[in-house]
Amino acid sequence: MCDRSLYRSGYVGSLLNLQSPDSFYFPNLRANGSQLAALPTISYPRSSIPWTCPSPCAAQPQGHAFGGAAQPYLPGSVPISISSNSNKECLEENSKYYAHDASSKQEERCRQRQSFANDPTITHAANLKPAKYDHSSLPRSLHGSAALFEVNSCTSSLKEDIKNSVNLNLTVQPAAVQSCLRPSVQDGLPWCPTQGRSRKKRKPYTKQQIAELENEFLLNEFINRQKRKELSNRLNLSDQQVKIWFQNRRMKKKRVVMREQALSMY
């Protein structure tokens, strides 16, 4: 039987030129975190590191896992160390650092706003007032009768201006409307003939007139011009009114006949 010691990883690795598992990690570290004395330590120059943590985190003792070497900064990550106490201190310092930075930025913004508000050269919209009512520059002794007199005079002048404008609107507006409604005689033709010509009001027929027209319609549906003139003179109607009444009466009779025919079919 063959010896099983020949199949060990150290012997097979030496034949196949394979490195030991410790070589895949940091060459100066072991699994238990101790440092090899024979191998040289890895050291990075401090200028090559883009970011270093604050003073308690940067000044770590040499007895830790990484020794004097510092870990490069990766964006979105937190510096990692084996000791839990130093990691907690680092996180606390980072939070303090960023909180202090944010508070300092807010203080700067508040100072800028205060300086902007206190700047006398800049006038705000809320502080804009008419010059007549601004008495802040006057001494207190002049805020008595002179200021009241000026305010009263301003209010009275404003009231007079409002009254005059209202009176002008009331007097000018109807005149303008009447001038638009009246026909323009100078031009020869009315500006709007429909407005210039007044429409006659409809006069309803009296019962006596309707009775006379109905009797004449029963005798003859179509009347001549002579008969129409006689009816108009007798009933005190115009020739056009008599003509229109007979036309409407014939249409009414036609509708009645068509309705009776439709009902008889059903």
UniProtKB/Swiss-Prot annotation:
Compartment(s) where it occurs, according to its Swiss-Prot or TrEMBL record: Nucleus
Q: Which UniProt keywords apply?
A: Developmental protein, DNA-binding, Homeobox, Nucleus, Transcription, Transcription regulation
Q: One Gene Ontology cellular component annotation?
A: transcription regulator complex
Tissues/organs with expression: Expressed primarily in limb buds.
SMART domains, sorted: HOX (SM00389)
Q: What does the entry give for GO biological process?
A: embryonic digit morphogenesis; pattern specification process; skeletal system development
Entry GO MF terms: DNA-binding transcription factor activity, RNA polymerase II-specific; sequence-specific double-stranded DNA binding
Cysteine pairings via disulfide bonds: none
Q: What is its main location?
A: nucleus
Keyword Lyase tagged: no
Give the highest taxon in the source lineage. Answer: Eukaryota
Q: What role does this protein play?
A: Sequence-specific transcription factor which is part of a developmental regulatory system that provides cells with specific positional identities on the anterior-posterior axis.
Q: How does it assemble?
A: Interacts with MAF and MAFB.
Q: What is this protein called?
A: Homeobox protein Hox-D12
Which gene name does the record give? HOXD12
